[in-house]
Amino acid sequence: MLLDHLKRAAAERDAQSLTRRRRIAHTACAPHQSVGGIDATPTPLLTFCSNDYLGLANHGSIAHALAEGAHRYGAGSGASHLVSGHSLAHAQLERELARWLAPYIPQAQALYFCTGYMANLAVLTSLGATGATLFCESLNHASLIDGARLARADVQRYPHGDAGALDALLAASTTALKLIVTDSVFSMDGDIAPLAALLEVAERHDAWIIVDDAHGFGVLGENGHGVLEHLGLRSERLIYIGTLGKAAGVAGAFVAAHETIVEHLINTARPYIYTTAAPPAVAHALLTSLEIIAGEEGRSRRAHLTGLIAQLRAGLAVLAAQAGWSLGESETAIQPLIVGDNAAALALSAALEAEGIRVGAIRPPTVPAGTARLRITLSASHSAADVARLLETIARAAPQLHKEAA
């Protein structure tokens, strides 16, 4: 019976400390947030687990633009983009995003999606259906993995960050169309893919690169244009996917690529064609977000975030060495503190929450077995005092955890 089967599966997850449960935020996304049950009095917590890297999710100007967009366009789009749901706000947003990516991708055109998951599925299923072979980085995000599976294409995986191994796979391939698929900033480790080396390999073997810059767009680069600006890359072989619900603070995602590729997606990508367009108000708000990211305020926020990252890493390095944990090789706002054991990661997360600090414990299958961790993420809305409090609280919790484990 289905219910009995599912109950056994749930019991197995519980036994392995793998059960996931949702939490309810009663206030806006911000470092200081109230969290609790739907009818219970919420608890104020200092949070280090959102992807709101620039602190724009609760920005007054963006919230005002969202309300302005709703007043102008209404609450919803009413149809898919190819029927009647493609608004002026959507078109303006796509034009601005194409302008942002034009220095890095010749003849760039942009296409807006409701979510990053949809954008990744759209690109991989549409381009993968052309008889391509997909050469996928081993630590890609789940949406890229699912997209590759749904594409029903030949898929080959290369080890994390290993351009040499990728080169060998491409050299051995006889497929006419070769697509390299990689995250830019890896979501659970925070390190950056060696895109310059990957691009050299792509050019040598007449391949194309699909880059998911979910955690780089808005954060990396002098103007916040993302990983391509950060690394100084330019090529028509780049197919860029950016997320607008993380550093940009709103919702959605986009694909930027040579106009021929984008027109192909408009006409063949099922996740784009067969869904209702996002509310135009969201696109309208994103135009304000882009102005902030590229302006002086955005530069100031990125500079502040860089300082917080250095402060956190310096403190975590000491704590990890003392506790026998490890600190990931990340220079981004994603800082993994790798504890190892699932139960230990949950216990550390719970100990922090008991002191008023919320940090998520990440366990398999999201990360490999034996690498359970606290995924600490920073926002430009955090203060140096917030980071100091986190470090002090981890320092107090660590000895007790080791005592209980002994």
Swiss-Prot record:
Its cofactor is pyridoxal 5'-phosphate. Pathway: Cofactor biosynthesis; biotin biosynthesis. Pfam families: Aminotran_1_2. Substrate binds at R20, H141, T366. It is an enzyme of class 2 (transferase). The modification N6-(pyridoxal phosphate)lysine is found at K246. Pyridoxal 5'-phosphate binds at G116, Y117, S187, H215, T243. The keyword Transferase applies. Disulfide bonds: none annotated. Keywords: Biotin biosynthesis, Pyridoxal phosphate, Transferase. Its EC number is 2.3.1.47. GO terms for biological process: biotin biosynthetic process. It catalyses: 6-carboxyhexanoyl-[ACP] + L-alanine + H(+) = (8S)-8-amino-7-oxononanoate + holo-[ACP] + CO2. Catalyzes the decarboxylative condensation of pimeloyl-[acyl-carrier protein] and L-alanine to produce 8-amino-7-oxononanoate (AON), [acyl-carrier protein], and carbon dioxide. Homodimer. NCBIfam families: bioF (TIGR00858). Belongs to the class-II pyridoxal-phosphate-dependent aminotransferase family. BioF subfamily. This is 8-amino-7-oxononanoate synthase. It comes from Cupriavidus metallidurans (strain ATCC 43123 / DSM 2839 / NBRC 102507 / CH34). The lineage of its organism: Bacteria, Pseudomonadati, Pseudomonadota, Betaproteobacteria, Burkholderiales. The gene is bioF.
